[in-house]
């Protein structure tokens, strides 16, 4: 499914908080609806097969938005691909990729199916922020 390394950063950290606040300003939800910031490192050959970011839980607090931030761009391959849209994106350092995971705030949308193509050389570093419908615990 995935070949990467992961770390989680607490939103209470002042620097992390500023990054998350900027990201969440793209949405109609407050910071308290966000998960911790996820940092990912994909080494050479690292990938993530196409998947959906949202899921349903017993309380219906689904992930509504995904924000991917590019921390570097000195690698080959590793594009973020949306197979159902026939699109792929190679982000530059500092770029953000923002997309809705739900259609009409309720149903999973086929448009949000995405993955990471294999890194051909170098390391790909990104961070993800997921914003939920309701406050996230």
Where are these regions (language model features)?
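Fe(II)/2-oxoglutarate oxygenase catalytic core
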Residues: 1-137
């Amino acid at each position: 499914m995935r070949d990467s390394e992961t770390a989680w950063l607490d939103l209470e950290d002042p620097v992390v908080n500023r990054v998350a606040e900027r990201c969440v300003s793209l949405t109609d939800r407050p910071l308290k609806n966000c998960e911790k910031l996820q940092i990912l490192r994909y080494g050479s050959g690292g990938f993530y097969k196409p998947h959906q970011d949202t899921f349903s839980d017993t309380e219906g607090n689904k992930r509504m938005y995904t924000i991917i931030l590019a921390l570097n761009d000195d690698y080959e391959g590793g594009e973020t691909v949306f197979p159902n849209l026939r699109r792929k994106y190679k982000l530059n350092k500092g770029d953000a990729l923002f997309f809705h995971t739900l259609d009409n705030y309720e149903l999973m949308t086929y448009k949000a199916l995405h993955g990471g193509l294999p890194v051909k050389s170098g390391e790909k570093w990104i961070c993800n922020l997921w914003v939920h419908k309701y406050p996230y615990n």
